[in-house]
Amino acid sequence: MARAKKSKDSQPLDLNNCQPLEHLQPVPKTRSASIISVESTDSEGGVVEVLAPPQVREFDDLTAFEAFVRDETWDNDFDYFHGRLNYYPPFIMKECHDNLDKIKPTANKNSRKFKRNLQHHVARHLIKDLEKCCGYELHMDKFDTIETPNRITWKFKDESDHGFSKEEEDEYNRHWRLELSVSCNNENPMVEVDYKAIPI
């Protein structure tokens, strides 16, 4: 699994001491390296410049994932990142006393108790903690549920102004949407989180 690079200036994550993002800034100059030219599919068939998708960072620790989100905000890349997290939720680790061998075989998407606890964890902890790490407002109250026999996925989307004025977003051309996908399967309590910020 690819790890996030550690910088010398990296600070431990303190959710109670994350600085909010008060004002937007211009797009970082390094972003121009991510612009690629592709052939347009419209009738003219010209060449159009588009922004390549951000590099996906993989994590297996919730704290490291939250620190990554915080660092992207500090680096002024809050509107252009993609992170994936695979982890056992804290309520499972508490239940098995941090011993993975003691995880109940029924702790999966087929258990109503597990789904209820996971929904509570996502709504009351994960999204709230991500909001602190981002430093701006998240509006992820509504979600779509996709359930198959093997997997359940909750998809959240935030296309709001994130607490900034329209004038400020227009001034720096910083319009972005956030997509959060949380899923689990019918075999184990491992939770998969996919979180991305996409400029629009």
From Swiss-Prot:
Main location (coarse class): membrane
GO cellular component, one term: plasma membrane
Keywords: Cell membrane, Membrane
A biological process from GO: energy reserve metabolic process
Membrane-topology descriptor: Peripheral membrane protein
Disulfide bonds: none
Subcellular location: Cell membrane
Claim: Cell membrane is one of the keywords in the record: yes
Highest rank taxon of the organism: Eukaryota
Region called Disordered, residue ranges: 1-26
Family per similarity comment: Belongs to the RGI1 family.
Function: Involved in the control of energetic metabolism and significantly contribute to cell fitness, especially under respiratory growth conditions.
Full protein name: Respiratory growth induced protein 1
Species in which this protein is naturally found: Scheffersomyces stipitis (strain ATCC 58785 / CBS 6054 / NBRC 10063 / NRRL Y-11545) (Yeast)
Gene giving rise to this polypeptide: RGI1
